[in-house]
Amino acid sequence: MTLQYFSDETVNFRTPAEPREGEPFTVRFRVLKGLETTVSLHLTADGEASSREMKPVREEGIYVFWEAEAEGVRDKAEYYFITAAEDGTVWYYGKNGLSQMAAEVQPFTVLPHFSVPEWARGAVWYQIFPDRFANGDPSNDPVDGEYTDATGVPCRHAAWDEPVTAGDFNCFYGGDFQGIIDHLDYLKELGTDVIYLNPVFVSPSSHKYNTQDYEHADPHFGVIVKDAEGADRYGIRTTSKENLEASDALLAKLIEGAHSRGMRVVLDGVFNHCGDFHKWMDRYGLYRKYTGEVGAWWDSECRSSRFFRYLGYHEYESWWNNETLPKLNLDGSKELREEIFRIAEKWVSPPFNADGWRLDVAADVAHSPEANHAFWKEFRQHVRAARPDALILAEHYGDASSWLSGDEWDSVMNYDAFMDPVSLFLTGMDKHSNGYDPEEEGDGALFWDRYSKASARLPQQSLQTALNELDNHDHSRFLSRTNHTAGRLGPLGPGEAEKGVSKAILRAAVVMQMTLPGAPGIYYGDEAGLCGFTDPDNRRPFPWGKEDTVLQDFYLNAVRLHKNIPVFRDGSLVPVIMDDDLAVYGRFLGKEAALVVIHIGTEPARLRIDLSDVTGAAPHAVTRVLHSSTLACSLGRKNVPTPMGTVDLNLLPQSAEIYVW
């Protein structure tokens, strides 16, 4: 498709792309040559609206670029473009494209005080679920029956390759910090920039979203110096000073090891709720017995009783009515808020020096939107004061724009503008494998509609740092979605998640992950060929010694392309063809450009693409740097002449290709 009008928030169309307070900036608007129109800029700066004429300043191939200057702003600017044809037709252009009414326009934004860490833009993430990545120290492994709680008795899997079971939430494989340390070189070789660790603080579960102690790393991941037998084992292991200090030191060593290899580490912050084991609640009396601390379960007048909302005797507000997850009363206790801020500062400060926080269910924190926003504003101030380049990334489903103005979150886990539209287009499956819709699969126009609307809600800073994952600990493995099997582990069994999967479709997904705007995130084991339904089956142990090495090599090279081709980090994105079984898009930065072709049909297809649709000026030749299909996979470079400015493609089934010029 040849776009008649185009602009965005990249450096291609705004200079500087992110103006600071009071800094003048230039905006540009691209118009198809031959359209008889005038263009004006409608600007609202610090609440004051104005309009000004734009001027055509240069031509590039089939396009004319119009420009206007804007004065610096103090707090915020919004703008959109107005085109007026000779026949009186008026169009309005904003982040959501063309509109016939000004009220429908989603304006471009300038946020002078919104600064995200430079290292996070386009960074390649690797997410690790610690219990399932690697067991580097069997001496710290949980044992069968180490404790008993409302969810049952924990178990230790006898073998690393034992299948996950439906009731696996309290079962352990023994993965730990030492296992991660032992494989830091593997992560570096893969191209990892950021290691994202699922929760690592003291907790009785394998997932550790039911925090027991925010102050310390879990000794089952760290070091057990002091141990006991029988009923005292869990209490001694998780409350003794020797174990906690040694485990904290090992986590610091892990982070230091990552830093020495040029990688960052982001921790998982679960501040909406804690666990009923937490010393502030202490439902099972561990801290009362082993440290002398008294929790709210035992004393309704103790300091931490105000950290929860009580509904009656031993009845408290919990997250989704799960009694093992008491909800923290953050808007009702200033003391609790200060505790959380101190904890957040602690882990991004020496000697730990974590590089930021991923925030669990961040929109659920507190009990009102006002209290939620107030909390995250304070949280950001504390974390950035402790570490100015710390990243604050939220788990969020839906429109996050109200948190993305520069004083709360930096960005989000990108469900709306990546995981959802990509999964539905490539597989017809939702991210939980709850159902298969053949009408969704391969609908390129619907994919682009979903993607463009969701990405338009993100400021450019947030879009570049949004975590683009195909799957994670909460959702089915992408590779399993390719077989169109809807269901869960319990009824179906683990084998059904592995039957008839398409690694060609997975490779196409990886190509999209590495070439669309944002920060691509690899969930541990995806690169090795792990399958699995949604949790707990998506948390299978990493298959060390049984990896799909061909797939690993593909990931490694796709990551290199993402990192070595600047347009994939900073460039503009334009749709070229969005049709049945096709998603073709271009990225460009100045005169450098790339074309990405995704064809998921099961039959070969022929396609002619006019390359001037990307940048305006068509090249005389392009270089293919990646090709993948059901029949072949090539990561070598191949020069392709384009004497007429077009490229003729013979697309193999379920193929993905990248061309650069």
Predicted regions span which residues?
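C-terminal beta-strand-rich structural cap/linker in extracellular carbohydrate-active enzymes
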Residues: 33, 124, 639-661
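Short, solvent-exposed turn/loop segments enriched in Gly/Ser/Thr/Pro and often Arg
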Residues: 130-132, 195-207, 268-278, 360-365, ...
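Substrate-binding/active-site clefts of carbohydrate-active enzymes
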Residues: 130-193, 200-351, 379, 385, ...
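Glycan-association/targeting regions that enable binding to alpha-glucans and other polysaccharides
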Residues: 1-122, 126
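Conserved, mostly hydrophobic/aromatic
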Residues: 29, 128, 187, 197, ...
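Aromatic- and carboxylate-lined catalytic core of secreted/periplasmic carbohydrate-active enzymes
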Residues: 543-576
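Carbohydrate-binding surface patches
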Residues: 16, 26-28, 576-616
